[in-house]
């Protein structure tokens, strides 16, 4: 009996062990299945190859003085290109990896390319990257929202609320292909549409030169350009005035307000630089028409995306019709990229936001240049006051996008020529409707551009000698400072 009982107990024990073993195996198998399913769902398929290509190109070394892009290549002749992306060097650098500085190269202080923000986006490479499928939004329109992304509109309203630079609640938002298209759409919407009494487009001197160039280029019988708003301040006979107010102003960074106060006068506010990295945000702007662009906001000039905030429904409708007939909406890829970048900024780390990075960079550049010019008796810069900023909750130092430099000597009436003799290429004052004793110098370029500018200005001021150099007119390329 004892042996039978022992055998029975062993059998039961064996069954228990087998049962436990089977359960363990079953659990392990289930876990493995879930892991396999998870890894399978995370595994890249069609996006794997373009992702690898993007990583490979981004890793190309350009000695810190240039960038390689997927679509960059060295053209050997019209029908043949060298294989693979190559480095595109910053101004005054050359070589296969941009390793050679060209000391005699003129400083590029003309361009308004906002490349000062490039380091921020490189630091946020993962969160700002995006992959676009070959079949992404092939239609002309978004479902139920026409030519404009509803999600992007919502993000723009959210961004303005965070920064506190514009009232958007109860306002219409319309997209355009950069700032240039929006300016003309707004002028068209506000014009009298009367060939016998055309509207006059008037900015305040110094003004952003694109206003004049574009208005004259697209000039219709319904409107024409006039140089100075101050000439029309006391004119009550003219009822069709459209004042373009740039605030902060390009080129001098001043916070302008409309001068024309007649009931029939209209104003378009260029708010492209009304962001906390360029100026103090004192209150939300609440103008009838306010224009903004992605290039001035986050640096992506090549995306060609801008937007207008409009109060009046009739004006909004006329602008919308103009933009629809002009380009049938804005590129869906541009809207997608704008949306992606907007999310990065909204969800940004508090310790290093784009606004912090941008403000520190521009403030430091202005301080360095101003410190050098302030000791000169030959040159001066515009005066910009310290102001309280509601976004940063503190009094902030100036950080303008451009330096508006003036030659102080009576005999030096062509300041552009004076700087050109010192290998510094800026934009003439007359380009902005002002005297040629002024020159606009861009501060928004690469760090290489700014360092080179600072070096040449130091040399020029250290000499402080009369200079009667007279150079040929060097035009400021329109597309270099949009």
Residue ranges and their predicted role:
Residues 28-57:
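Ser/Thr/Pro/Gly-rich low-complexity linker/stalk segments immediately outside membranes or between
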Residues 2-32, 86-88, 97, 101-482:
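PLP-dependent class I/II
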Residues 55-65:
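Disulfide-braced loops of extracellular cysteine-rich modules
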Residues 58-59, 73, 95:
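Onset and early core of a folded interaction/catalytic domain in large eukaryotic regulators
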Residues 68-70, 75-92:
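Extracellular cysteine-rich, disulfide-stabilized repeat modules
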Residues 65-67, 72-73, 230-236:
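Immunoglobulin-superfamily Ig-like beta-sandwich domains in protein ectodomains
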Residues 57, 75-79, 394:
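Short helix-capping and inter-helix turn/linker motifs at the boundaries of alpha-helical repeat units
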Residues 51-52, 82, 415-417:
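Short, 15-30-residue, compositionally biased linear elements
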């Amino acid at each position: 009996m004892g042996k039978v009982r022992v055998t029975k107990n062993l059998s039961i024990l064996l069954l228990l062990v087998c049962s436990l073993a089977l359960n363990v195996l079953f659990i392990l198998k289930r876990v493995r299945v879930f892991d396999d399913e998870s890894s399978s769902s995370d595994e890249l398929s069609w996006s794997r190859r373009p992702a690898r290509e993007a990583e490979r190109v981004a890793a190309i070394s350009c000695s810190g003085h240039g960038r390689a892009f997927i679509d960059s290549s060295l053209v050997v002749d019209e029908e043949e290109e060298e294989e693979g992306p190559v480095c595109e060097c910053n101004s005054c650098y050359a070589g296969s990896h941009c390793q050679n500085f060209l000391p005699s190269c003129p400083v590029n202080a003309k361009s308004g390319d906002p490349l000062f923000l490039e380091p921020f986006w490189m630091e946020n490479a993962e969160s700002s990257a995006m992959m676009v499928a070959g079949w992404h939004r092939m239609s002309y329109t978004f479902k139920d929202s026409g030519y404009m992304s509803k999600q992007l509109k919502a993000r723009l309203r959210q961004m303005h609320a965070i920064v506190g630079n514009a009232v958007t609640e109860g306002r219409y938002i319309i997209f355009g292909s950069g700032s240039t298209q929006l300016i003309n759409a707004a002028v068209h919407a506000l014009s009298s549409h009367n060939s016998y009494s055309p509207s006059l487009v008037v900015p305040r001197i110094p003004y952003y030169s694109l206003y004049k160039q574009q208005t004259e280029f697209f000039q219709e019988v319904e409107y024409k350009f006039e140089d100075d708003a101050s000439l029309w301040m006391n004119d009550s006979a003219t009822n069709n005035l459209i004042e373009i107010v740039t605030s902060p102003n390009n080129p001098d960074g001043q916070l302008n307000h409309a001068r024309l106060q007649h009931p029939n006068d209209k104003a378009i506010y260029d708010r492209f630089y009304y962001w906390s990295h360029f100026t103090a945000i004192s209150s939300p702007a609440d103008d009838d028409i306010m224009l903004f662009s992605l290039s001035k906001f986050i640096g992506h000039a090549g995306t060609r995306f801008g937007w207008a905030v409009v109060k009046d429904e009739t004006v909004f409708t006329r602008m919308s019709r103009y933009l629809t007939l002009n380009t049938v909406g804005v590129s869906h890829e541009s809207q997608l990229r704008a949306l992606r970048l907007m999310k990065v900024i909204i969800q940004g780390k508090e310790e290093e936001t784009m606004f912090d990075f941008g403000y520190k960079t521009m403030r430091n550049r202005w301080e360095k240049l101003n410190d050098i010019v302030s000791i000169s008796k030959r040159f001066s810069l515009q005066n910009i006051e310290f102001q309280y900023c509601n976004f940063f909750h503190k009094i902030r130092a100036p950080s303008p996008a451009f330096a508006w430099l003036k030659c102080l000597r009576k005999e030096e009436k062509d300041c552009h020529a004076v700087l050109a003799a010192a290998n510094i290429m800026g934009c003439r004052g007359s380009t902005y409707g002002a005297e040629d004793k002024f020159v606009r110098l861009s501060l928004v370029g690469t760090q290489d551009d700014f360092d080179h500018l600072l070096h040449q200005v130091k040399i020029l001021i250290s000499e402080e000698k009369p200079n009667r150099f007279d150079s040929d007119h060097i035009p400021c390329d329109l597309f270099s400072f949009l």
